[in-house]
């Protein structure tokens, strides 16, 4: 067997997972994390088929049952691949795979038993061992051998038994399964969602071309791999295969699109990273210093959530720290190791790539990347280029306007992964498959997919530049409170794009890929709709003409004015109109895909000599066929005779059965017939018909070439179209934020200050809880007052479930909304600009990293203390609860004391169930202040514990009782247990109170002797916990 190639273990991993009892079915979306090591090219695949036995599912469909279209093959589509279907032969059971008594034989002595198609498969497979191959055979796609076993299991389709391995000859054919070609897209996505790489091999010649041009007229059809896909690189390409009438807009592809990562960890702390998103063309790079726990890497993985990761380093394997972190974030990601090479290799390859792609069109970009980016970014870049070449996507790096830095400290802040998760920015943590209850769920009212993607970026990276924040806020005010005909018309255009499910951003990048590599990633209809959307928008802007400037006098937002001004300038150009004039939109209404191709171009504006030449040849042949028809009319004495078409067979002469048929020349060929008539072609018609088919097929080829040339023209104007998309996306995001303040009542524009850290809000509300509540009127609002000058640290106590966590999350969410440029739920607000927001909240452990709850708690605190600034907002929830009470109090006190005395002086909200920490208010008056969540205690008889009514309002003071027994009651703990606990709690409290004088004297002695401050704090906690 051939040596292992890139990614090969992704297939062997599937068999391994089967033998280790991982069961896959049609509802599975991924399998466990897969590490692919490319350093050992000689290692062979170990698929462990001995442990895998295919068991047909009762619901599995046979290959013929799947072909619901029941299309009937014409002679034009016949093939001579020698791949017989088991029609009359009784199929063997799956057990026959293992029970066959035939002995394995050598390849050389048995290769003659393979059909021509199977030999072709073996040749393809030997050079593509890392892929599942789907091979086109007529109107079907077939999987053979190991590929068939995997495909049949995932797709729940029948497996026809046979040989599994390439060098196995126990049976007279390979095991196989098949799917109809018009269902390829659907089945392909299911395979890709299992983390597999799939190659699609198509027939590259037709019967007509083969019969005239081919040197081997009776041999095998030529096939080649026309597309290779993974989950991140597939963009609905194969929707073009099969049924031309399929409604592409009715099939929802992943709207956001997966990222592909490359990380250079050659230097353990100085890490370089590039992430590309094929569906949009986004390229995100970053360099950062990281620690052993890979906190910075985790943040980037959480934000971008890649499905494929390449890791470069100087070792023979990926570092344990990186592997652990990747598996924590996503244990289903495919991971590929790349050994680091000499830097000169990367430099030379970058130069070579840009000098050769598109005939040197982008040769200057090599110098640009080498001068602008450090070595560890250059290495990531070239490894991604090499990786993407197989998918024909590496020209993504030719669009430098799509390149951005992940952490741009001058314009935005990056929320740490712990903050993103704690605040549920993008995902509801109780239901990871839903975003309901997340910040994106609240703010996302975008009309288009491109607007949706941009809004996600806005939310993930709040602004730290006051001018940019104010521009967005003013834009929302203009859109919310002022009616404008121009703005209303532009809104309607976005609505049309959204309702039609047209993804301008995705389709434009597909044009770019296709123009360079001559791919079929985008259909003619998609191209037309793309241009038509641009034309409608620019034409609408033109219709306003000169009065546009007067209309925009009511707009005060510099951001909106820039958007409209740039769109007006772009509307003056005739680029879109010229491109639309070259095509005929009426052709797209034709249900026949080939007719669409032939009629697509308006040859008056798009002059292609090859198309014109083939059309002329076709016209000549059709004229000769008409001449032949005249001669046949004379011969048969039927002046009204015409050619007919039957079962897709054209140019047939229909004759009644009987004497008329008997009188025909013997060299006439019968094509088909019925009981009453027979249909023939004369030798001359047969000859001309073959010529006509040949020229028609050549015309289709030339139309495809012309279409690629047309895509190249569009791609030459990529930046023009990209500017339109960027402006429309920004406008869509502003409309979305405007909708938030319109749909929800009592939202206010925050006053942004940059000279001091402050959060002052009157009657503020948690925007998520407010929208999830059934009765809005019952929601309790709270004031927020925290600033650098006064009450910089809030120490918050109160009963369990009293609303402490909800309150501090509310503070963080409102700050983020303000810095996004959104209105916020309150009467009025003044907010400073924060460059970082750190949150340590919740109890969780990490088995993968052998880390306990307390270890994670301390690691996150350590990260916060190291990275905070004087412009940070810090929220700490119940620090110290992951360990014993004594150590927990000491840790909580020390951390809080450090945050108060630290010269960087961040604003801090500190939730605790250790009421003894309230002493810090006396120690640091005006800096630290005690607050608690309001409640009302309802006393009962001495035998029962008091009930608590939560008021959910923040009030001054400290609370010593957490009222945990009330939570136990809500959880359904039996009353007898709760009453017993209350009795015990009362006894302990009475014992402590009776011992108070002795404890006080001991504490004073301890202080006089200057013992450890921790002794003091522990004594205070134990004595005051029940006395306060």
Curated annotation (Swiss-Prot):
Q: Disordered: where is this region? A: 1-114
State the SMART domains in the record: MUTSac (SM00534), MUTSd (SM00533)
List, alphabetically, the InterPro entries matched.
DNA_mismatch_repair_MutS-lik_N, DNA_mismatch_repair_MutS/MSH, DNA_mismatch_repair_MutS_C, DNA_mismatch_repair_MutS_clamp, DNA_mismatch_repair_MutS_core, DNA_mismatch_repair_MutS_N, DNA_mismatch_repair_MutS_sf, DNA_mmatch_repair_MutS_con_dom
Compositional bias ranges of the Basic and acidic residues kind? 41-56, 67-88
Residue ranges for the region (Mispair-binding domain) are 109-232
Q: Which top-rank group of organisms is this from? A: Eukaryota
User: PROSITE patterns, alphabetically?
Assistant: DNA_MISMATCH_REPAIR_2
Question: Can you cite an annotated GO cellular component?
Answer: site of double-strand break
Q: Does the keyword Magnesium apply?
A: no
Query: Where in the sequence does UniProt note compositional bias of the Polar residues kind?
Result: 93-113
Select a single GO molecular function from the record's annotations and give it: heteroduplex DNA loop binding
The question of whether DNA-binding is a record keyword is answered with yes
Keywords per UniProt: ATP-binding, DNA damage, DNA repair, DNA-binding, Nucleotide-binding, Nucleus
Job description of the protein = Component of the post-replicative DNA mismatch repair system (MMR). Heterodimerizes with MSH2 to form MutS beta, which binds to DNA mismatches thereby initiating DNA repair. MSH3 provides substrate-binding and substrate specificity to the complex. When bound, the MutS beta heterodimer bends the DNA helix and shields approximately 20 base pairs. Acts mainly to repair insertion-deletion loops (IDLs) from 2 to 13 nucleotides in size, but can also repair base-base and single insertion-deletion mismatches that occur during replication.
Q: How does it associate, per the subunit comment?
A: Heterodimer consisting of MSH2-MSH3 (MutS beta). Forms a ternary complex with MutL alpha (MLH1-PMS1).
In Swiss-Prot or TrEMBL terms, this protein is called: DNA mismatch repair protein MSH3
Q: Which organism is it from?
A: Debaryomyces hansenii (strain ATCC 36239 / CBS 767 / BCRC 21394 / JCM 1990 / NBRC 0083 / IGC 2968)
* Organism placement in taxonomy: Eukaryota, Fungi, Dikarya, Ascomycota, Saccharomycotina
Q: Which gene encodes it?
A: MSH3
């Amino acid at each position: 067997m051939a040596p292992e190639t890139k990614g090969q273990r992704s297939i062997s991993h599937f068999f391994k997972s089967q033998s280790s009892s991982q069961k896959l079915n049609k509802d599975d979306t991924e399998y466990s994390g897969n590490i692919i090591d490319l350093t050992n090219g000689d290692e062979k695949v170990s698929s462990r088929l001995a442990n895998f036995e295919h068991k047909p599912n009762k619901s599995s469909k046979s290959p013929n049952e799947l072909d619901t279209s029941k299309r009937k093959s014409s002679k034009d589509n016949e093939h001579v691949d020698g791949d017989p279907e088991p029609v009359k032969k009784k199929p063997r059971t799956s057990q026959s795979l293992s029970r066959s008594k035939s002995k394995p034989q050598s390849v050389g002595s048995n290769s003659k038993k393979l059909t021509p198609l199977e030999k072709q498969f073996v040749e393809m497979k030997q050079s593509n061992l890392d892929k599942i191959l789907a091979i086109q055979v007529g109107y079907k796609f077939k999987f053979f051998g190991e590929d068939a076993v995997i495909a049949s299991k995932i797709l729940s389709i029948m497996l026809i038994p046979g040989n599994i391995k390439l060098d196995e000859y126990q049976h007279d054919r390979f095991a196989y399964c098949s799917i109809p070609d018009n269902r390829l897209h659907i089945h392909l996505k299911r395979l890709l969602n299992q983390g597999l790489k799939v190659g699609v091999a198509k027939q590259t010649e037709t019967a007509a071309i083969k019969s005239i041009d081919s040197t081997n007229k009776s041999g095998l059809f030529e096939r080649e791999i026309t597309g290779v896909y993974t989950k991140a690189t597939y963009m609905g390409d194969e929707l073009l295969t099969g049924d031309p009438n399929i409604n592409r807009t009715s099939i929802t592809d992943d709207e956001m699109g997966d990222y592909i990562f490359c990380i250079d960890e050659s230097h353990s702390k100085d890490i370089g990273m590039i992430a590309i998103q094929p569906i949009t063309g986004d390229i995100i790079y970053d360099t950062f210093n990281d620690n052993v726990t890979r906190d910075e890497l985790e943040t980037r993985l959480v934000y971008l959530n890649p499905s494929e990761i390449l890791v470069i380093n100087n070792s023979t394997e990926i570092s344990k720290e990186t592997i652990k972190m990747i598996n924590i974030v996503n244990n289903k990601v495919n991971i590929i190791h790349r050994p680091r090479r000499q830097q000169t290799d990367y430099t030379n390859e970058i130069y070579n790539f840009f000098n050769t792609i598109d005939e040197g069109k982008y040769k200057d970009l090599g110098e640009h990347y080498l001068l602008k980016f450090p070595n560890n970014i250059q290495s990531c870049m070239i490894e991604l280029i090499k990786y993407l070449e197989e998918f024909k996507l590496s020209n993504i790096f030719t669009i430098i306007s799509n390149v951005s830095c992940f952490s741009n400290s001058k314009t935005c802040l990056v929320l740490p992964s712990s903050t993103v998760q704690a605040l549920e920015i993008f995902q509801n943590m109780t239901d990871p498959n839903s975003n309901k209850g997340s910040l994106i769920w609240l703010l996302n009212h975008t009309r288009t997919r491109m607007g949706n993607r941009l809004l996600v970026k806005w939310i993930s990276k709040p602004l730290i530049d006051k001018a940019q924040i104010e521009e967005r806020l003013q834009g929302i005010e203009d859109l919310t409170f002022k009616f404008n005909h121009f703005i209303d018309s532009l809104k309607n255009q976005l609505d049309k794009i959204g309702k039609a499910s047209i993804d301008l951003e995705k389709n434009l990048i597909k044009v770019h890929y296709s123009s360079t590599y001559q791919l079929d990633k985008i259909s003619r209809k998609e191209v037309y709709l793309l241009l038509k959307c641009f034309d409608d928008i620019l034409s609408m802007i033109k219709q306003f003409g000169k009065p546009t400037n007067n209309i925009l006098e009511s707009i005060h937002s510099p951001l909106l004015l820039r958007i409209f001004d740039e769109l007006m300038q772009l509307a003056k150009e005739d680029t879109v109109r010229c491109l639309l004039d070259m095509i005929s939109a009426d052709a797209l209404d034709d249900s026949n895909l080939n007719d669409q191709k032939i009629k697509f171009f308006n040859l008056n504006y798009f002059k292609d000599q090859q198309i014109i030449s083939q059309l002329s040849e076709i016209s000549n042949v059709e004229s000769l066929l008409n001449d032949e028809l005249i001669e046949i009319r004379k011969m048969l004495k039927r002046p009204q005779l015409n050619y007919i078409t039957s079962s897709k067979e054209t140019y047939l002469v229909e004759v009644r059965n009987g004497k008329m048929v008997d009188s025909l020349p013997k060299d006439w060929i019968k094509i088909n017939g019925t009981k009453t008539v027979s249909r023939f072609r004369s030798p001359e018609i047969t000859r001309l018909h073959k010529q006509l088919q040949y020229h028609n097929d050549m015309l289709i080829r030339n139309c495809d070439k012309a279409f690629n040339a047309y895509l190249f023209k569009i791609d030459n104007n990529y930046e023009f179209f990209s500017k339109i998309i960027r402006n429309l996306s920004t406008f869509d995001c502003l409309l979305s934020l405007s909708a938030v303040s319109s749909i929800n009542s009592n939202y206010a524009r925050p006053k942004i200050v940059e000279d001091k850290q402050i959060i002052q809000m009157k009657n503020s509300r948690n925007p998520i809880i407010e929208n999830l509540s059934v009765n809005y009127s019952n929601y309790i609002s709270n004031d927020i007052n925290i600033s650098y000058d006064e009450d910089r640290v809030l120490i918050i106590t109160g009963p369990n479930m009293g609303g402490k966590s909800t309150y501090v999350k509310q503070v963080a969410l409102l700050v983020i909304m303000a810095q996004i440029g959104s209105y916020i739920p309150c009467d009025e607000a003044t907010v400073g600009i924060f460059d970082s927001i750190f949150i340590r909240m919740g109890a969780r452990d990490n088995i993968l990293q052998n880390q306990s709850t307390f270890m994670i708690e301390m690691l996150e605190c350590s990260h916060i203390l190291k990275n905070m600034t004087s412009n940070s907002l810090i929220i700490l929830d119940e620090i110290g609860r992951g360990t014993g009470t004594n150590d927990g109090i000491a840790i909580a006190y020390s951390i809080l004391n450090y945050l108060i005395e630290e010269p960087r002086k961040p604003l801090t909200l500190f939730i605790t169930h250790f009421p003894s920490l309230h002493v810090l208010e006396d120690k640091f008056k005006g800096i630290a202040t005690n607050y608690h969540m309001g409640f009302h205690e309802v006393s009962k008889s001495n035998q029962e514990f008091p009930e608590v009514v939560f008021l959910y309002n923040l009030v001054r003071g400290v609370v010593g009782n957490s009222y945990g027994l009330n939570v136990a009651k809500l959880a359904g703990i039996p009353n007898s247990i709760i009453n017993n606990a209350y009795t015990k709690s009362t006894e302990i409290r009475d014992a402590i109170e009776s011992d108070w004088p002795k404890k006080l004297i001991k504490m004073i002695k301890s202080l006089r002797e200057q013992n450890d401050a921790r002794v003091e704090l522990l004594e205070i906690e134990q004595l005051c916990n029940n006395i306060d």
